[in-house]
Amino acid sequence: MEIINCHVHSFTQAHTPDRFLPWPVPLLVRIPLVRRILRWVARLVDRDRKSALGRYAQIIDTSYKRTQREVFEIVRGFYPEGTRFVLLPMDMTKMNAGSVAVGIDAQHAEIVALRSAYPDSIVIPFAAVDPRHEGVVEKTIALIEQDDFRGLKLYPPTGYHPYDPRLWPLYEYAQEHNLPVLTHCSRPASVQYRGKPTPEMLTDPDSGELLDLGRFELLTRFTDPDAYKPMLKKYPKLRVCLAHFGGAGDWTRYLDKPWHSETERPNMSWLAKILDMLRADTYQTCGPTSATPSTPTMSTFTFSKCCSLTRE
């Protein structure tokens, strides 16, 4: 049986700004002594690393590896020989949380080298895209055509609408070449824009409406399943994967109040919204692509879910 882990992050602390997590966690864990104390406390109270503290300690420990290859080797060690991995870079340079030591272009370049270092295409790289970067369309297409990247990775909570017009050429290209677009879909997003919303962020690109929302509500709107409907309407064959399937909190909400008992859509769990999209005549699940030839349409993994949608 072939195994494909469809959601792997290999970035290190060099790719993250000082305030990418709530203050003062990122600043404190940059101090080696603090990390050692955290590891000691985590082992003391949670030997199996099953609690939130244990998981965070493991994440911090791993992120302080020097290279993405070191991080990847840790992940790979948990899987049998022949397992393939979808690598999803994260672009945190525009989230107004401080500068990063290594930008997204260099992060992509390291993934290119990482992919070349392993046989049998066990590394399946996606390209992180952010419409605020100049040349994002040309650079992304070059990664796909020259370096064999297999899809697009979005993370709208860092400060942009998923339907931003600057991304339309990439969506058209992805639709034409049957490439998947994987986007973050859970709330609250732990990695998110830290500044005051800009006029650009507060303008809905579909309706032109000026949104009267605070930062948290705005960023939540960016990754709401409903935010992808204009995209699917404009690009009816675009393959969109809503990573985490709404998130663990919305799965809990769904179990408390299933989709059929909801009365107001704004109050629906995101799981319910996604299930409605899958059940509707307008949408259908879609099969594998050349990027992930044996990946099932719905992939389940610990603490998160993923599904693909296309519009008929």
Residue locations for each model-derived region?
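Mid-domain alpha/beta scaffold segments of enzyme catalytic cores
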Residues: M1-E176
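Catalytic pocket-lining loop regions of alpha/beta-barrel enzymes
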Residues: R150-G151, H161-E312
